[in-house]
Amino acid sequence: MPELPEVETALRGISPYLKNFTIEKVVVRQPKLRWAVSEELITLKNVKIVDLTRRAKYLIIHTEKGYIIGHLGMSGSVRIVPQDSAIDKHDHIDIVVNNGKLLRYNDPRRFGAWLWTENLDDFHLFLKLGPEPLSDEFNAEYLFKKSRQKSTALKTFLMDNAVVVGVGNIYTNESLFICGIHPLKLAKNLTRNQCFSLVNTIKDVLRKAIIQGGTTLKDFLQPDGRPGYFAQELLVYGNKDKPCPKCGGKIESLIIGQRNSFFCPKCQKRG
């Protein structure tokens, strides 16, 4: 599943081809995604795109009439292609602009979404989201206060979008390993020093992943078709039974919150 670095990579890749250009039309070949594609999209003609931003794992295309909100789901991707490009089986949506290009959304599993709102502040999917992990709002004191009385596994806690958005499974695994904290540690038992270390590490891991163009494991490619190279930097994620890069012991895995978790039992003591 594309996480924050992958979505940020997509945003940076598509923005130069869309910002300040005009939507000529939106072609919807498959409206049945996770939620039905908003009907307003197919009515967009001669509408200028004024900006592109991201909130959590949502792409936001700001137009002069409202906002197109895209989510890549489990297997979705976006790319910029010439308007005469051949259409593949899972190419569900095209946003055609007046520069000879179009934004094409491909999604084999159809768990993504393309929605419309005229008021971003009241958009229902954003109302309960926590802070952005790279923002100043996400800091050690915030994490410490948020974790009090939380008798849940730390890994699950960090992947809760009401706590902090977009960190995701891969980057939570990597951050906990770097900090030497067991993924099953109860959130309420975090110390202030551990919160300080975690916040700084999460920010550092995410920034590095963005620089590398995200992590390509299966479905994700950058908008220009290249893979994300952060997979080459992964320390524990997907490395079950391989040597720990710190101590040489064996990396183990277990299921936490229905997601695969990878850790070193020697370097990440539970407690």
Curated annotation (Swiss-Prot):
Binding note for cofactor: Binds 1 zinc ion per subunit.
EC identifiers of the protein: 3.2.2.23, 4.2.99.18
Catalytic activity: Hydrolysis of DNA containing ring-opened 7-methylguanine residues, releasing 2,6-diamino-4-hydroxy-5-(N-methyl)formamidopyrimidine; 2'-deoxyribonucleotide-(2'-deoxyribose 5'-phosphate)-2'-deoxyribonucleotide-DNA = a 3'-end 2'-deoxyribonucleotide-(2,3-dehydro-2,3-deoxyribose 5'-phosphate)-DNA + a 5'-end 5'-phospho-2'-deoxyribonucleoside-DNA + H(+)
Any one Gene Ontology molecular-function term assigned to this protein's record: class I DNA-(apurinic or apyrimidinic site) endonuclease activity
ZnF start-end (FPG-type): 235-269
GO terms of biological process kind: base-excision repair
Cofactor(s) the protein needs: Zn(2+)
Keywords for the protein's UniProt record, in alphabetical order: DNA damage, DNA repair, DNA-binding, Glycosidase, Hydrolase, Lyase, Metal-binding, Multifunctional enzyme, Zinc, Zinc-finger
Active-site positions on this chain: P2 (schiff-base intermediate with dna), E3 (proton donor), K57 (proton donor), R259 (proton donor)
InterPro entries associated with the record: DNA_glyclase/AP_lyase_DNA-bd, DNA_glyclase_Znf_dom_DNA_BS, Formamido-pyr_DNA_Glyclase, FPG_cat, MutM-like_N-ter, Ribosomal_uS13-like_H2TH, Znf_DNA_glyclase/AP_lyase, Znf_FPG/IleRS
Pfam families named among the record's database cross-references: Fapy_DNA_glyco (PF01149), H2TH (PF06831), zf-FPG_IleRS (PF06827)
SUPFAM superfamilies: Glucocorticoid receptor-like (DNA-binding domain), N-terminal domain of MutM-like DNA repair proteins, S13-like H2TH domain
Subunit structure: Monomer.
Name of this chain's protein: Formamidopyrimidine-DNA glycosylase
Originating gene: mutM
